[in-house]
Swiss-Prot record:
It holds the Pfam family Homeodomain. Gene3D superfamilies: Homeodomain-like. DUX genes are present in 3.3-kilobase elements, a tandem repeat family scattered in the genome found on the short arms of all acrocentric chromosomes as well as on several other chromosomes. May be functional despite lack of introns and of a poly(A) addition signal. Residues 102-127 are annotated as: Disordered. Keywords: DNA-binding, Homeobox, Nucleus, Repeat. Expressed in hepatoma Hep3B cells. Residues 46-105, 121-180 bind DNA. This is Putative double homeobox protein 3. One of its GO terms (biological process) is regulation of transcription by RNA polymerase II. Its main location: nucleus. Belongs to the paired homeobox family. PANTHER family: DOUBLE HOMEOBOX PROTEIN 1-RELATED, MIX-TYPE HOMEOBOX GENE 1-RELATED.
Length: 197
């Protein structure tokens, strides 16, 4: 069992300075499934030990979680060292806590603070008319990779921004590639060609 932590760890080890450690509490307790209290499939030498954190460790984890739902590896390592829990277990704790929070927010129909609002900051979809599509398709048949001057000319003809023309060609190439199957490469053409002479 790890050593007991008495008092507060040095401030340099704990990224959450507001967390206070209670003196005399063991840093962590590990339980193993050696008796018949767990189902058979949960027992055995390959199973991970269950981590039971002390109240002070839980306080430290919660304080850091409230400050940042997605802490970086350095923060998790400092926290793990400060409360004497292995870093992978700290990472799993954060994943589990985010999952619980997300479930609670879904039940209460509140927006999840860890994700941006899908409608906020999203570009409005550009509507392309049939005549604009026909013009772009003709240009695509002539040249699937038009340069800037050609795209600017298409922008003038269609009234669409050049950046939208560029994206339309990228999307069309991706769709065309998927529908037509893989085009043969130059190397495969050379390898499959009949020998000369």
């Amino acid at each position: 069992m790890p050593a007991e932590v008495h008092g507060s760890p040095p401030a340099s080890l704990c990224p959450c300075p507001s967390v206070k450690f209670r003196p005399g509490l063991p840093a962590m307790a590990l339980l193993t499934a050696l008796d018949d209290t767990l189902p058979e499939e949960a027992q055995g030498p390959g199973r991970r030990m269950i981590l039971l954190s002390t109240p002070s460790q839980s306080d430290a984890l919660r304080a850091c979680f409230e400050r940042n739902l997605y802490p970086g590896i350095a923060t998790k390592e400092q926290l793990a060292q400060g409360i004497d829990i292995p870093e992978p277990r700290v990472q799993i704790w954060f994943q589990n806590e985010r999952s619980c929070q997300l479930r609670q927010h879904r039940r209460q129909s509140r927006p999840w603070p860890g994700r941006r609002d899908p409608q906020k900051g999203r570009r409005k979809r550009t509507a392309i008319t049939g005549s604009q599509t026909a013009l772009l398709l003709r240009a695509f048949e002539k040249d699937r990779f038009p340069g800037i001057p050609a795209r600017e000319e298409l922008a003038r003809e269609t009234g669409l921004p050049e950046s939208r023309i560029q994206l339309w060609f990228q999307n069309r190439r991706a769709r065309h590639w998927g529908q037509s199957g893989r085009a043969p490469t130059q190397a495969s053409i050379r390898c499959n060609a009949a020998p000369i002479g």
